[in-house]
Amino acid sequence: GIQSPLRGSDPHAIRALVEQDGGYYEGDLPLPRVKSDLAAFETSVRQTREAGATVARVVLAGGRRYERFKTRAEFDAFYVQARDILTRIEPILKRHRLKLAVENHKDLTSEELAAMMGALASEWIGVLVDTGNNLALLEEPQTTIERLAPFVLSVHLKDMCVQPDAEGFLLSETPLGTGFLNLKHLVAILVRSNPDIVLNLEMATRDPLRIPCLTDTYFATFPGRRETHLEAALVRVKAHPPNYPPPSVSGREPARILAEEEANNRDGFSWMRANLRT
């Protein structure tokens, strides 16, 4: 199956292809930002359902928390706006019977996202749990998964590796089974909470992401996190050196990058078939 925006594709053709091949389709929608966006959003919801989706992904912020927001007040205003938007679109989702999965996208901590979902208390809005993203917010992986599992509607399945860096650490996606996440255990937690979820493999072949958690600007939106999370995160990095060199793309030919990307994803599917049989 696939999780993707329609991007102008005929939704009925997508549905026919999925039904023919026996797969699945999950949508990917942009959130409306102002009231005048609601009509276009409802059209996208309707088309996503016509394509056969019962779940669609959204992200709340278009960037990483520690890069996009400079002050706590700025972040708080964004949080309130995001919660209000989800409240406003809930009747549209209910009308078309499409569930919306909000990804933990390096924007909200798992505590904040779980609190938002609890306040909404809607069967039509839940979480797309990305197994790796909250490492960028200094979280322990199992804690993240356990906190978000009650709301899970979809999954981005990743394995991750970490390396020390002068300003914090480097975070990389790595082929499933080669990183330090206990994926079988994390998946078991999620499936126990929602047996109907699908596991979407996400394996982007790119340069490591710098997590600048030794800088003051990183903590601008959650200053207390330096005291509560930093030491444990750095210990975790030191305790889990990469088992294999992480992917990188700088200075490499596009054709070689694409070949490695395909190989990494094929390896991921093979790992899933061998290790996640139900």
Predicted features along the sequence, with ranges:
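Active-site acidic/histidine proton-transfer and metal-coordination neighborhood
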Residues: 20-26, 32-126
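Histidine-acidic metal/acid-base catalytic patches
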Residues: 110-124, 135-278
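Residues at structural and domain junctions
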Residues: 68, 75, 99-102, 130, ...
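Acidic-and-aromatic substrate-binding clefts and catalytic sites of carbohydrate-active enzymes
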Residues: 2-14, 31-39, 104-111, 133-139, ...
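Flexible loop residues that form catalytic
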Residues: 6-7, 61, 160, 204
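N-terminal pre-domain/capping segments
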Residues: 1-55, 84-87, 122, 223-278
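Hydrophobic faces of well-ordered beta-strands that scaffold small-molecule active sites
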Residues: 2-4, 25-29, 56-58, 100-102, ...
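The substrate-binding groove and active-site-proximal loops of carbohydrate-active enzymes
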Residues: 28-35, 72-76, 132-133, 173-178, ...
